Regions:
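Basic, Lys/Arg-enriched alpha-helical interface segments
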Residues: 1-58, 67-74, 78-86
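Acidic, metal-associated active-site segment
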Residues: 63-64
Length: 86
């Protein structure tokens, strides 16, 4: 987890988001390396072309980097589209 991700999770907690939903998505990624289609996971492009994004609920997003050959995940952001992309 990055420092930014930790700050993002604190902001989401203050907003009253159900953090169990985020934890569930993270656990699924850790266990399976992917998410079900209901999360709408997809690869990003441009400045974020090494990252993936999914929808936790509505406009609440999770962004992460994934290296399948090394079996690593790096959670880099969570929040709304405007929080994360300006």
């Amino acid at each position: 987890m990055t420092k930014t991700f930790r700050k993002d999770t604190e902001r989401c907690q203050k907003r009253g988001y159900n953090m169990e939903l985020l934890k569930t998505a993270i656990r699924l990624l850790e266990a399976q390396g992917s998410l079900p289609p209901s999360y709408r996971p997809h690869k990003l492009s441009g400045n974020y072309d090494s990252s993936w994004e999914c929808h936790i609920k509505g406009d609440w997003l999770l962004i992460w980097e994934q290296n399948d050959s090394e079996l690593t995940l790096l959670f880099t952001g969570t929040g709304t589209h405007s929080d994360l992309f300006g």
